[in-house]
Amino acid sequence: MTEAWRYSAQGISVALRVTPRGGRDDIDGLETLANGRTVVKVRVRAIAEGGEANRAVTELLAKALGVPKRAVRVLSGTTSRLKQVAVDGDPNELGEALRKLTAPKPD
Protein backbone atom coordinates (compact mmCIF):
# COMPACT_ATOMS: atom_id res chain seq x y z
CA MET A 1 0.00 0.00 0.00
CA THR A 2 1.34 3.42 -0.88
CA GLU A 3 1.56 6.28 1.57
CA ALA A 4 -1.41 8.62 1.87
CA TRP A 5 0.83 11.67 2.18
CA ARG A 6 3.24 13.68 0.09
CA TYR A 7 6.31 15.50 1.28
CA SER A 8 7.09 19.18 0.67
CA ALA A 9 9.65 21.67 1.94
CA GLN A 10 7.09 23.02 4.46
CA GLY A 11 5.83 19.67 5.76
CA ILE A 12 3.39 17.12 4.37
CA SER A 13 0.04 16.97 2.61
CA VAL A 14 -2.21 14.15 3.83
CA ALA A 15 -5.20 12.57 2.06
CA LEU A 16 -7.97 11.73 4.55
CA ARG A 17 -11.31 9.97 4.58
CA VAL A 18 -13.22 11.41 7.53
CA THR A 19 -16.15 9.85 9.36
CA PRO A 20 -18.03 12.52 11.33
CA ARG A 21 -20.12 11.37 14.31
CA GLY A 22 -17.79 8.37 14.45
CA GLY A 23 -18.18 7.75 18.19
CA ARG A 24 -14.60 8.71 19.07
CA ASP A 25 -11.71 10.83 17.84
CA ASP A 26 -9.14 8.46 16.35
CA ILE A 27 -6.93 7.58 13.42
CA ASP A 28 -7.99 4.18 12.06
CA GLY A 29 -5.14 3.35 9.70
CA LEU A 30 -4.96 3.38 5.91
CA GLU A 31 -7.55 2.52 3.28
CA THR A 32 -7.31 2.09 -0.48
CA LEU A 33 -10.29 3.64 -2.26
CA ALA A 34 -11.96 2.13 -5.34
CA ASN A 35 -9.91 4.46 -7.57
CA GLY A 36 -6.66 3.13 -6.07
CA ARG A 37 -5.94 6.22 -3.98
CA THR A 38 -4.65 5.60 -0.45
CA VAL A 39 -6.12 7.69 2.38
CA VAL A 40 -5.76 7.90 6.15
CA LYS A 41 -9.03 6.91 7.84
CA VAL A 42 -10.03 9.39 10.55
CA ARG A 43 -13.13 9.40 12.73
CA VAL A 44 -14.31 12.27 14.91
CA ARG A 45 -17.20 12.68 17.34
CA ALA A 46 -18.11 16.10 15.92
CA ILE A 47 -20.96 16.53 13.46
CA ALA A 48 -20.37 17.68 9.89
CA GLU A 49 -22.07 21.02 10.40
CA GLY A 50 -20.65 24.52 10.60
CA GLY A 51 -17.09 23.28 10.18
CA GLU A 52 -17.15 21.36 13.48
CA ALA A 53 -15.85 18.12 11.97
CA ASN A 54 -13.06 19.99 10.15
CA ARG A 55 -11.98 21.65 13.42
CA ALA A 56 -12.04 18.28 15.17
CA VAL A 57 -9.91 16.73 12.40
CA THR A 58 -7.28 19.48 12.53
CA GLU A 59 -7.16 19.30 16.35
CA LEU A 60 -6.84 15.50 16.28
CA LEU A 61 -4.02 15.58 13.72
CA ALA A 62 -2.19 18.38 15.55
CA LYS A 63 -2.29 16.45 18.82
CA ALA A 64 -1.37 13.11 17.23
CA LEU A 65 1.56 14.60 15.29
CA GLY A 66 2.78 16.86 18.10
CA VAL A 67 2.41 20.13 16.18
CA PRO A 68 0.52 23.33 17.05
CA LYS A 69 -3.10 23.55 15.84
CA ARG A 70 -2.13 26.45 13.56
CA ALA A 71 0.26 24.09 11.69
CA VAL A 72 -2.67 22.00 10.36
CA ARG A 73 -5.09 23.31 7.74
CA VAL A 74 -7.62 21.83 5.34
CA LEU A 75 -6.50 22.41 1.74
CA SER A 76 -9.51 20.90 -0.01
CA GLY A 77 -12.65 18.96 0.76
CA THR A 78 -14.09 21.21 3.47
CA THR A 79 -17.59 19.90 2.70
CA SER A 80 -16.57 16.35 1.77
CA ARG A 81 -15.51 13.21 3.62
CA LEU A 82 -12.41 13.13 1.40
CA LYS A 83 -10.02 15.89 2.43
CA GLN A 84 -6.50 17.04 1.70
CA VAL A 85 -4.81 18.49 4.79
CA ALA A 86 -1.47 20.30 5.05
CA VAL A 87 0.71 19.88 8.14
CA ASP A 88 3.63 22.26 8.58
CA GLY A 89 6.81 20.93 10.19
CA ASP A 90 9.74 18.64 9.51
CA PRO A 91 8.49 16.39 6.68
CA ASN A 92 10.60 13.39 7.71
CA GLU A 93 9.44 13.51 11.34
CA LEU A 94 5.82 13.98 10.29
CA GLY A 95 6.01 11.10 7.81
CA GLU A 96 7.50 8.79 10.44
CA ALA A 97 4.83 9.79 12.96
CA LEU A 98 2.09 9.06 10.40
CA ARG A 99 3.63 5.67 9.59
CA LYS A 100 3.43 4.76 13.29
CA LEU A 101 -0.11 6.14 13.68
CA THR A 102 -1.41 4.26 10.64
CA ALA A 103 0.41 0.98 11.25
CA PRO A 104 -1.88 -2.03 11.72
CA LYS A 105 -2.79 -2.37 15.39
CA PRO A 106 -2.23 -5.74 17.08
CA ASP A 107 -5.39 -7.53 18.19
Swiss-Prot record:
Gene3D superfamilies: YggU-like (3.30.1200.10). Pfam families: DUF167 (PF02594). Coiled coil: none annotated. It comes from the Bacteria. Belongs to the UPF0235 family. NCBIfam families: DUF167 family protein, PRK01310.1. This is UPF0235 protein RPC_0058. It comes from Rhodopseudomonas palustris (strain BisB18).
